[in-house]
Amino acid sequence: MTPQEHLPYADPEKGGLKLLAPLRVLDLTTSIAGPYATQLLADLGATVLKVEKPGAGDDTRAWGPPFLQDVSLWYLSVNRNKHSLTLDVSQPAGREVLDGLLAQSDVLVLNMVPRVQRKLGLDYDSLKAAYPALIHASLTGFGLTGPRSDFPCYDLIAEGYAGIMDLTGELESAPQKVGTPAADLLAGQDLALAVLAAYIARGQHGRGTQIDISMQSSMTRFVSPRLLPYLGSGELPRRSGGKDSVIAIYQVFDTADDPLSLGLGNDRIWQRFWQAVGDPAFGARTEFASNAHRRTHREAIVMRIAELLRAQPRAHWLALFAEHSIPAGPINRLDQVAQDPDLLDKRLIYRARASNGAIPQVGLGIGFDGSQHVHRKSPPALGEDTDDVLRGWLGYAGPRIDALRERGVI
């Protein structure tokens, strides 16, 4: 038995969102960032055609363990609501198929470096004359220009370039990667946002757009609340285990049993905290009158709060802080997140039926008219929609499809 057994099923009556139903997206990406971007578009209702290498498919299909019924769970995390077509675009017959699909698509998404795009004739300059309305969206490690534009890149590499690893962890520890593929997910989110903007603009002027997303740039923008203060002050932030926030009290504290997070983000919350814990006089001291004052005396304040919170279990403090509108929360493990009744009720975490049994999913998490239901189609098996796409999009008959398959084109 796996943890998904307690998850609610996606409601088939809901049918998913259809906000982007007219949009057709041709997705030639692999790994996480690009597929995450196109899953966001698919969740909103776009038709996403995932073009994969015959026999191998998306790199994430081989990422594991863990696997579920021989399917990579990493692959399952970023590929729902899509259709899979296997196609060797390097063969002339494969390129002919791709050109037919491009003629019927609104968006092309790539995560090939510029050199490979040019080699395959899939760069913006090679396509814009034949497909002037096509939105050409490129997601690479370092963008389409610059000295690193042809460098390969993964999330780990982008995090290192952007400075986030140097800020993550304890001061005495080595730099640490963020606990999720943050650069992948942020760059993917940026691409989805950019596609929506380009789609709106095309509706106004009828032309396509070249979109250039860099994982390094997306991740660098992510650290702007730390980078900008350095640029303006010259004070270089260092790893601190999350204890160096501009907010004086904004960190994790131990309690009598489990740790909690606490954020006293303004003067009103500061006063409410000390009222709640029964020591309003401490909170009213003039040397703690503002956040700047409290930062000066942070060490003494942290010692006092730590002493207080160790006296009672976490549940006691969270109930008290909720009553007094004080921002605080648990430090959940993923197994606890997976059992959060609010997330389950909203179907953010759910399971869906697939050809080989039930699969777990994490939804979009955005409500539209009171609903967060996005599931229309489980992540596809490799090439499961190839014949349907060739027939439905391009009008190919059975013998022509069979010939392509025999030649290894599909």
Located regions from the model:
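N-terminal helix-loop segment corresponding to the beta1-alpha1 unit
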Residues: 1-204, 381, 387-410
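Terminal low-complexity tails and localization/encapsulation signals of metabolic enzymes
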Residues: 1-24, 237-238, 248, 254-255, ...
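Short, well-structured beta-strand/strand-turn elements
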Residues: 48, 322-336, 396-401
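Glycine-rich beta-alpha junction loops
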Residues: 55, 142-143, 215-220, 257, ...
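Conserved Rossmann-fold dehydrogenase catalytic segment
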Residues: 144, 172-180, 203-219, 238-245, ...
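Oxidoreductase and adenylate-handling cofactor-binding alpha/beta cores
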Residues: 188-208, 222-232, 275-281
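Aromatic-enriched alpha-helical interface/lid elements that frame and gate functional surfaces
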Residues: 248-324, 328
